[in-house]
Amino acid sequence: MRTKIKSLRGTTPEVRALIGHDITLKGWVRTVRNQKTFTFIEINDGSTLSNFQIIATPDIAGYDQLINQLSTGVSVSAIGTIVESPGKEQNLEMQATAITIIGKCDPEVYLLQKKRHTFEFLRSIAHLRPRTNTIGAVTRVRNALAFATHQFFQKRGFLYIHTPIITGSDCEGAGKMFQVTTLDQNNPARTPEGRVDYTQDFFGKPTYLTVSGQLNGEIYACALSDVYTFGPTFRAENSNTSRHLAEFWMIEPEMAFADLNDNMDCAEDYLKYILKYVLDNCQEDMEFFNKHVATDLISRLEHVINTSFERASYTYAVRILEKADKKFEYPVKWGLDLQSEHERFLAEEFFGKPVILTDYPKDIKAFYMRTNEDNKTVAAMDVLVPKVGEIIGGSQREERLSVLESKLKEFNLPAEEYWWYLELRKFGSVPHSGFGAGFERLVQFTTGMENIRDVIPFPRHPGKADF
């Protein structure tokens, strides 16, 4: 039975109890150091940031041949006795009695040499980059954030639902969607008027990859009260930035009988919960990021966890920005959407902590957001955090049928495509709210990584769909 390196870390009684016992380790060689009478071999199995040291001596069967074949990237199986290590770098090490090479790795052509590689280069070898310290640590933190997400909502009685990837509606009304079709691209079926005849397509209508599971989530919230989705979403935006992906994951809770204040409370509690979970359960990886990526990372996250989020209206935020003694690249004016530089100024410099902005102009927000009494703003909210800006966006949903019908017209959206969404307002309509959190943005914020393409296993962006 294989023992994972993670279980050999630390000085707990459970770890100390392994001293003197024979175990089997399997992993990939990181370092080989030949001495006169023995060889140090460090392997890593991905369960933890740390490598584990194995000591091989000439009395191991096939020692000379083995040592000649060992190099970075070789996969091995090692059997031996766990002993206390005299070295400062580790508490325990293995005195090997047998080492077997599982898979060879030619050092002449292996792309991951023992040197610092740029993240841009690592993206070009995404099939190998999980073997690096940074991407391995990102992946473990990403896993912890996903687990904490489910734990947070499950503890609060939310039901996890699966919403469709293929959809016939545009949740955001932005039109930047990937189309799904089985029609012949060179010679698609056409109507007598010469238009593409989507009645001949697989689904009998135009269909797309979803931009959000929200509308479907609302259906279940209006029957089961509290639900959440956690799945992939797609945006066909030609954005080549460090903050945008064409394929990313979204966490989207929907709560019946909840207003905007309930929504803000949930978003704040959620963000604090997942950050605390990671700091408590990924200490080694987080210390790595704090040392090598952002030296103020842990203190920044602790500040978010221990601080009550400021709450302010969009209108108040615009006044702050207009009076700010700072030159912005993008103009500030009531009715315009805030840019990342504005959001970061508010969170980092003015408030000095996370802030939730509310009540945005209705013309810059989605059709489904509840119109406020002033008929100029909607019950929307964005959570802004230092170093990132917006990290969560949500709203109270429009539950009034007549208002929703009017808004579909205002946004030039065909009511017949949203007939089911409108019917929710006909039969037992209730106030309800929800938000969306881009999972990769959360990973980026938690790890301090500069580029969002380095916090998802296989990034999809304009011009790139490799691996």
UniProtKB/Swiss-Prot annotation:
InterPro entries, per database record: Aa-tRNA-synt_II, aa-tRNA-synth_II, aa-tRNA-synth_II/BPL/LPL, Asn-tRNA-ligase, Asp/Asn-tRNA-synth_IIb, NA-bd_OB-fold, NA-bd_OB_tRNA
GO biological process, one term: asparaginyl-tRNA aminoacylation
UniProt superkingdom: Bacteria
Cited HAMAP family: Asn_tRNA_synth
Oligomer and partners: Homodimer.
EC number of the protein: 6.1.1.22
PANTHER family to which the protein is assigned, alphabetical: ASPARAGINE--TRNA LIGASE, MITOCHONDRIAL-RELATED, ASPARTYL/LYSYL-TRNA SYNTHETASE
Keyword Coiled coil: no
Name of this protein: Asparagine--tRNA ligase
Primary enzyme class: ligase
Record-linked PROSITE patterns: AA_TRNA_LIGASE_II (PS50862)
Similarity-based family: Belongs to the class-II aminoacyl-tRNA synthetase family.
Molecular function (Gene Ontology), one example: asparagine-tRNA ligase activity
GO cellular component: cytoplasm
Pfam families for this protein: tRNA-synt_2, tRNA_anti-codon
Predominant subcellular localization, coarse grouping: cytoplasm
Subcellular location field: Cytoplasm
